[in-house]
């Protein structure tokens, strides 16, 4: 017999139009100051802050509520050094043959290269893994759905939570990055999705002078 789904009353916040407009505008202005940062301070951060950030990310919606993600938090200097060494090896290959000339030209305004010192300087690395399937205690495999979309949304929540905490982050995607699965000893059903250094910005940190697309370029109303 099919089990009847359990439901509870929705208890989310609701606002009158004026307050709604004010809150949405304030949040937009706050998030518009979020920037990708590559110059980190090694200043310590309480682990509890990172835990809150990760748990916020875990509130993201997911296909069939499978929550197909694992957030691996790394602060151990030796492990961070291994990750940097492996990442720089892949990035060296990317910058010296794997990337197209067009790609390299698009990266020029950011001043990036294969050196990734932030992987050791930032106090925490959050490595996001996607889970193609879950493994039950008896070894049975249960498929997950819309894994890429679900984990991508969770990463958006993660970045917003990092900004909300007054910290900065970098979305780093060395390619390929299967070395993360090996270094962090993750099971076969998990694959690395995103590597996110988290911390305070270094004193005097600089970011590229960029402009975001305006409303007309990103929004269509019917």
From Swiss-Prot:
<dbReference type="InterPro" id="IPR000415">
    <property type="entry name" value="Nitroreductase-like"/>
</dbReference>
<feature type="binding site">
    <location>
        <begin position="171"/>
        <end position="173"/>
    </location>
    <ligand>
        <name>FMN</name>
    </ligand>
</feature>
<dbReference type="GO" id="GO:0010181">
    <property type="term" value="F:FMN binding"/>
</dbReference>
<keyword id="KW-0288">FMN</keyword>
<dbReference type="InterPro" id="IPR029479">
    <property type="entry name" value="Nitroreductase"/>
</dbReference>
<protein>
    <recommendedName>
        <fullName>Iodotyrosine deiodinase</fullName>
        <ecNumber>1.21.1.1</ecNumber>
    </recommendedName>
</protein>
<dbReference type="Pfam" id="PF00881">
    <property type="entry name" value="Nitroreductase"/>
</dbReference>
<keyword id="KW-0521">NADP</keyword>
<feature type="binding site">
    <location>
        <position position="95"/>
    </location>
    <ligand>
        <name>3-iodo-L-tyrosine</name>
    </ligand>
</feature>
<keyword id="KW-0560">Oxidoreductase</keyword>
<dbReference type="InterPro" id="IPR050627">
    <property type="entry name" value="Nitroreductase/BluB"/>
</dbReference>
<feature type="binding site">
    <location>
        <position position="212"/>
    </location>
    <ligand>
        <name>FMN</name>
    </ligand>
</feature>
<dbReference type="GO" id="GO:0140616">
    <property type="term" value="F:iodotyrosine deiodinase activity"/>
</dbReference>
<comment type="similarity">
    <text>Belongs to the nitroreductase family.</text>
</comment>
<feature type="binding site">
    <location>
        <position position="116"/>
    </location>
    <ligand>
        <name>3-iodo-L-tyrosine</name>
    </ligand>
</feature>
<keyword id="KW-0285">Flavoprotein</keyword>
<comment type="function">
    <text>Catalyzes the dehalogenation of halotyrosines such as 3-iodo-L-tyrosine and 3,5-diiodo-L-tyrosine. Likely to also catalyze the dehalogenation of other halotyrosines such as 3-bromo-L-tyrosine, 3-chloro-L-tyrosine and 3-iodo-L-tyrosine. Activity towards 3-iodo-L-tyrosine is much stronger than activity towards 3,5-diiodo-L-tyrosine and 2-iodophenol.</text>
</comment>
<comment type="subunit">
    <text>Homodimer.</text>
</comment>
<feature type="binding site">
    <location>
        <position position="91"/>
    </location>
    <ligand>
        <name>3-iodo-L-tyrosine</name>
    </ligand>
</feature>
<feature type="binding site">
    <location>
        <begin position="61"/>
        <end position="62"/>
    </location>
    <ligand>
        <name>FMN</name>
    </ligand>
</feature>
<keyword id="KW-0547">Nucleotide-binding</keyword>
<feature type="binding site">
    <location>
        <begin position="34"/>
        <end position="38"/>
    </location>
    <ligand>
        <name>FMN</name>
    </ligand>
</feature>
């Amino acid at each position: 017999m099919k089990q009847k789904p359990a439901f509870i009353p929705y208890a989310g916040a609701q606002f009158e139009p004026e307050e709604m407009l004010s809150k949405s505008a304030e949040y937009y202005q706050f998030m518009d100051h979020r920037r990708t940062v590559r110059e980190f301070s090694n200043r310590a951060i309480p682990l509890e802050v990172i835990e809150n950030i990760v748990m916020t990310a875990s509130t993201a919606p997911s296909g069939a509520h499978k929550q197909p993600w694992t957030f691996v938090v790394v602060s151990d200097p030796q492990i961070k050094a291994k990750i940097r060494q492996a990442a720089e090896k892949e990035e060296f290959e990317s910058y010296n043959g794997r990337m197209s000339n067009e790609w390299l030209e698009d990266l020029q305004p950011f001043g990036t290269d294969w050196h990734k010192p932030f992987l050791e300087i930032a106090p925490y690395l959050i490595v996001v893994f996607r889970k193609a399937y879950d493994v039950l205690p008896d070894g049975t495999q249960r498929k997950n759905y819309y894994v890429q979309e679900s984990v991508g949304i969770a990463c958006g929540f993660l970045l917003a939570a990092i900004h909300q905490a007054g910290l900065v982050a970098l979305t780093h995607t060395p390619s390929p990055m299967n070395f993360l699965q090996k270094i962090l000893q993750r099971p076969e059903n998990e694959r690395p999705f995103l590597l996110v250094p988290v911390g305070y910005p270094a004193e005097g940190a600089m970011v590229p002078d960029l402009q975001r697309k305006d409303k007309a370029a990103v929004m269509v109303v019917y």
